[in-house]
């Protein structure tokens, strides 16, 4: 019984230690296909390498939140960090600016990464 209690305590301590680890997300914004003005495409925001899992991701058009956005299920890598893909249909043109805004405990303010059509 004492051995079980010791093992249980060690497991709990190791799990609580995982919550203390914080890793900032890496943010990548790109289109599914090479951008052509007036041609429908998909805008992707891939957020990876973050911990803990609580995160808020918004796709933006001219600084305003795009409402019709889909995303993958929250998944984790071998190192126990998390990753997600947010995406939406869009039609690029010369005047509109697109970006991905991410809020995470590792950022003091939300971080915004702009989409560059040549990336």
Swiss-Prot record:
SMART domains: IGc1. It comes from the Eukaryota. Keywords: Disulfide bond, Immunity, Immunoglobulin domain, MHC I, Secreted, Signal. Residues 25-114 form the Ig-like C1-type domain. It is found in: Secreted. Disulfide bonds join 45-100. InterPro entries: B2Microglobulin, Ig-like_dom, Ig-like_dom_sf, Ig-like_fold, Ig/MHC_CS, Ig_C1-set, MHC/Immunoglobulin. This is Beta-2-microglobulin. The lineage of its organism: Eukaryota, Metazoa, Chordata, Craniata, Vertebrata.
């Amino acid at each position: 019984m004492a051995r079980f209690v010791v093992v249980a305590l060690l497991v709990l301590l190791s799990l609580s230690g995982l919550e203390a680890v914080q890793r900032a997300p890496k943010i990548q914004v790109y289109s599914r296909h090479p951008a052509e003005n007036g041609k429908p495409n998909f805008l992707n925001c891939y957020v990876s390498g973050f911990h803990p899992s609580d995160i808020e991701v918004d796709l933006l058009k001219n600084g305003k939140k795009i409402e019709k956005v889909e995303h993958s299920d929250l998944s984790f890598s071998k190192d126990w960090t998390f990753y997600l893909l947010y995406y939406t249909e869009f039609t690029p043109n010369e005047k509109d600016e697109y970006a991905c805004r991410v809020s995470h405990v590792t950022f003091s303010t939300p971080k915004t990464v702009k989409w560059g059509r040549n990336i």
